[in-house]
Amino acid sequence: MVPVVALVGRPNVGKSTLFNRLTRTRDALVADFPGLTRDRKYGHAHFSEHDFIVIDTGGIDGTEEGVETKMAEQSLAAIDEADVVLFMVDGRAGLTPSDVAIAKHLRQLEKPSMLVVNKVDGIDPDAASADFWQLGVEDMYQIAAAHGRGVTALIDLALNPFAEALKAENGEVSDLTEFEDEEEEQVDFTEEEAEEEFKRLQDQPIKLAIIGRPNVGKSTLTNRILGEERVVVYDMPGTTRDSIYIPMQRDEREYVLIDTAGVRRRKNINETVEKFSVVKTLKAIEDANVVLLLIDARENISDQDLSLLGFALNAGRSIVIAVNKWDGLDNDVKDRVKKELDRRLGFVDFARIHFISALHGTGVGHLFESVQEAYKSATTRVGTSVLTRIMKMATDDHQPPMVRGRRVKLKYAHAGGYNPPIIVIHGNQVRNLPDSYKRFLMNYYRRSLEIMGTPIRIQFQNSENPFEAKTNKLTISQERKRKRMMSMVKGRK
């Protein structure tokens, strides 16, 4: 499973700075969708070949007695369900009553925690950290999140136990290297590795995660999909943050249904108050191929829904949206709901939207048509010649802009990975292309390849000049001739 790191601390200690550094996105097209809220509290982070989820739990401000009331309920749940807690304090401001209150609260949770003293750049780190020994910690870690100093070692220490556990579980050797430079760009797959990834995906069942806010009908939809008389035997022992994985078959296609709400007998569904778990939902998104977001038609789409969609986009997951409880609404309300969806979901205009009733089964069957379509789009093999031809057509329709007096030249394109589809474009100065032109290329590929239900990632590689590192080496006769010419030029002066 993907480890979860929670950032905890009072306001203005640098949690957002560290969050932004950890959740940086290589390709602006992945994160910078028009209309997508940027006020995210959780995100996907990369450490070498290791992925993890990072959660900014928000600032706590107040006295010890105010900890329970000042901290949001979801933040408490996120801390409780996280694998590691990074307790951040401000080295310049020193120890405060809020820091003491938070430390006491974390001790009660008995959660693996690391005290992180931030903002130690330009000052004596040991002197700035001295007061924090009063918190009774065994060790503390000094960083400057704004400049990235110390972040590599911190993340290495936090994730190393999980890398070892994963290595033992898979019987593989895990290579944890340094945290990659923020400006560095790399291609996820070579063409050969992309081909291997394609073959692997064809042999696997589709992992479908049903996510959404509490009481939107996730359990009802799950039971509808599995069948009315299905006896629930999937509540296997495990931690409360583990989702339930249910193998199933539909239309001669194998699936694994990832249920974040828990499958319950129908008679108990209405009696159970569902507890929403952010961590459980994020882990389900990470582990899925296709994400099905369920929305209640009787409620407005929330910022939380948009944040979940944004997380799914950044994770590269295919997306299908279902609006539940559609039956019984009058036409005026339906029109208003559709307009609101169009207004707020423009950044996922590639995703199919279905209007269903999970309770009565209306429209549920069509969901799997879109799930299969999205997965097929995410895993369809496209050759280098086709991708290059589409790229040439795009540049003929709209030339790349000039950069520093020279026009950007796109040479060729090839597949760089699947699920999501990754297109690698090689050329001169391609990394200097503006986001607007990158978005034009992405939309052009989507229309040309008829890709629906999945985000597209385009990565750019500057072609290397094979003669750039070479110097002209003159022969002896050439050296003599050059000297004679130089002396003649000087003589004329």
UniProtKB/Swiss-Prot annotation:
Top-level lineage group: Bacteria
Residues that hold GTP 1 according to the record: 9-16, 56-60, 118-121
Family named by the database record: Belongs to the TRAFAC class TrmE-Era-EngA-EngB-Septin-like GTPase superfamily. EngA (Der) GTPase family.
Annotated keywords: GTP-binding, Nucleotide-binding, Repeat, Ribosome biogenesis
Annotated residues for binding of GTP 2: 212-219, 259-263, 324-327
Species classification: Bacteria, Pseudomonadati, Pseudomonadota, Gammaproteobacteria, Vibrionales
One MF annotation (Gene Ontology) recorded for this entry: ribosome binding
Domain EngA-type G per the UniProt entry, residue ranges: 3-166, 206-379
Record carries keyword DNA damage: no
Organism expressing this protein natively: Vibrio atlanticus (strain LGP32)
Subunit structure: Associates with the 50S ribosomal subunit.
Record-annotated KH-like domain positions: 380-464
HAMAP family named in the record: GTPase_Der (MF_00195)
Protein name as it appears in the record: GTPase Der
An individual GO BP term: ribosome biogenesis
CDD domains documented for this protein: EngA1 (cd01894), EngA2 (cd01895)
Function per UniProt: GTPase that plays an essential role in the late steps of ribosome biogenesis.
Gene: der
